[in-house]
Amino acid sequence: MDFQQLADVAEKWCSNTPFELIATEETERRMDFYADPGVSFYVLCPDNGCGDNFHVWSESEDCLPFLQLAQDYISSCGKKTLHEVLEKVFKSFRPLLGLPDADDDAFEEYSADVEEEEPEADHPQMGVSQQ
């Protein structure tokens, strides 16, 4: 996929997230993204026909630790698309953006109807002597 097509994918992705594509550099194949409050990162796109993966990084010390999830994902087996990489970055930055963690939402919905049962008093608990 040529760089302009990748930039189009990035623009479309931005329309569904708080991020803006603030700069593109075709010679470096770099795209810079920004969202309030000061969340920024960039993506280096692999050359056509090259075996390299995408690379994500941030020049912000506050943002960099949150990118670990996305970096691990990119380095895992299999080719990733730009959209997949950007989605993983968005998920990584949700806490910085003040958004709930997507996984937490699913877990809360699933466990919301579960009622805790009180242990019955007439059954002895294991390991507790009855005297």
Swiss-Prot record:
Induction: Up-regulated by NF-kappa-B RELA/p65. Up-regulated during 12-O-tetradecanoyl phorbol-acetate (TPA)-induced megakaryocytic differentiation of K562 and HEL cells. Residues 107-120 have a biased composition (Acidic residues). Keywords: Cytoplasm, Developmental protein, Phosphoprotein. Residues 107-131 are annotated as: Disordered. One of its GO terms (biological process) is positive regulation of ERK1 and ERK2 cascade. Phosphorylation at Tyr-34 is essential for its ability to promote megakaryocyte differentiation. One of its GO terms (cellular component) is cytoplasm. The keyword Secreted does not apply. It is found in: Cytoplasm. Its main location: cytoplasm. The modification Phosphotyrosine is found at Y34. Promotes megakaryocyte differentiation by enhancing ERK and JNK signaling as well as up-regulating RUNX1 and FLI1 expression. Represses NF-kappa-B transcriptional activity by inhibiting phosphorylation of RELA at 'Ser-536'. May be involved in early neuronal development. This is Maturin. It comes from Homo sapiens. The gene is MTURN.
